[in-house]
Amino acid sequence: MGLLDAGFSRDNVLVAPVDAVLNWARLSSLWPMGFGLACCAIEMMATNASNYDLERFGIFPRSSPRQSDLMIVAGTVSMKMAERVVRLYEQMPEPRYVLSMGSCSNCGGPYWEHGYHVLKGVDRVIPVDVYVPGCPPRPEALIGGLMKVQELIRMEQIGMSRQEALKKLAETGVEPRPFIERERSSAGA
């Protein structure tokens, strides 16, 4: 007996808010565009490899900003490169998200004090949704950051601004740390 033979009874109907259905579809198909600039890019590439299998989370790396909804800025952003970061960000369709990966893209890293050529954080030129600390952060930390972006998408509602969604996410206290710890413990076993 197939679905059509059984008919459409109340048991076959799923009732959910439109927000929940749209957010589920968006968070289950994140298409990040990697913007690797320094050593953090190596860790980002390792995360995209088969050992970590991002596709199990519905995350498929894209090379074009017009096909992406998430930009991962990984590494040192120089003043000259900042213009390109902004240009690529503007080419991405809405809704778009930014994940800053590593100390250099978060706050300038070791170049903070004496590096006149380094941007002191990518958030000075584009809005950043999730920061992943580390120098360079491990692939597990990047996966945790991607999970944080998915939680941010899950919390959004139609008509809600990004700042309201970030505030709502912070109030729930959702943290990706348990996932990171579980991955490390299973990798060592």
Curated annotation (Swiss-Prot):
Protein's gene: nuoB
Claim: Manganese is one of the keywords in the record: no
Cellular location(s): Cell inner membrane
Subunit structure: NDH-1 is composed of 14 different subunits. Subunits NuoB, C, D, E, F, and G constitute the peripheral sector of the complex.
Record function comment: NDH-1 shuttles electrons from NADH, via FMN and iron-sulfur (Fe-S) centers, to quinones in the respiratory chain. The immediate electron acceptor for the enzyme in this species is believed to be a menaquinone. Couples the redox reaction to proton translocation (for every two electrons transferred, four hydrogen ions are translocated across the cytoplasmic membrane), and thus conserves the redox energy in a proton gradient.
Catalytic activity field: a quinone + NADH + 5 H(+)(in) = a quinol + NAD(+) + 4 H(+)(out)
Name of this protein: NADH-quinone oxidoreductase subunit B
Keywords (A to Z) from UniProt: 4Fe-4S, Cell inner membrane, Cell membrane, Iron, Iron-sulfur, Membrane, Metal-binding, NAD, Quinone, Translocase, Transport
Classification of source organism: Bacteria, Pseudomonadati, Chlorobiota, Chlorobiia, Chlorobiales
Keyword Cell membrane assigned: yes
InterPro entries: NADH_UbQ_OxRdtase-like_20kDa, NADH_UQ_OxRdtase_20Kd_su
Cofactor(s) it depends on: [4Fe-4S] cluster
Binding residues for [4Fe-4S] cluster: 39-40, 104, 135
Enzyme Commission number: 7.1.1.-
Topology of this chain in the membrane: Peripheral membrane protein
Domain of life: Bacteria
Chief localization: membrane
Enzyme class: translocase
